[in-house]
């Protein structure tokens, strides 16, 4: 298992609340790639890649692709990821975050 950094040094880009908006996420990643310090820049996703938008699976795939291309990427789970994990039975979750019907019908 890879160690999880507890301290980040150097430049940081923070991305949050993507909500399945893959075209916007692609544009953000393309803009970051143009930065002269990208090789040492951390890219931190602060949650909510999924839910609401048109392509939550695509947003997760873009994140996974970025992890393969750039060694300084991390993702903090947001409430929507926790709700999804609870709905899938991966974690215990309170009833109020059960989006099973909504996700099954929408996605």
Question: What is the predicted role of each segment?
Answer:
Residues 39, 52-107:
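Active-site neighborhood of divalent metal-dependent phosphoester bond hydrolases
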Residues 1-62:
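N-terminal active-site segment of His-dependent metallophosphoesterases
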């Amino acid at each position: 298992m890879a160690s999880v950094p507890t301290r980040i040094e150097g430049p940081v880009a923070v991305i949050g609340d993507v909500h399945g908006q893959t075209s916007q996420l692609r544009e953000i990643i393309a803009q970051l790639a143009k930065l002269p310090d990208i090789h040492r820049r951390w890219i931190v996703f602060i949650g909510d890649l999924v839910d609401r938008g048109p392509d939550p699976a695509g947003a997760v795939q873009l994140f996974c692709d970025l992890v393969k291309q750039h060694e300084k990427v991390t993702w903090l789970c947001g409430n929507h990821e926790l709700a999804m994990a609870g709905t899938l039975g991966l974690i215990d979750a309170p009833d109020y975050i059960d989006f099973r019907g909504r996700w099954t019908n929408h996605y």
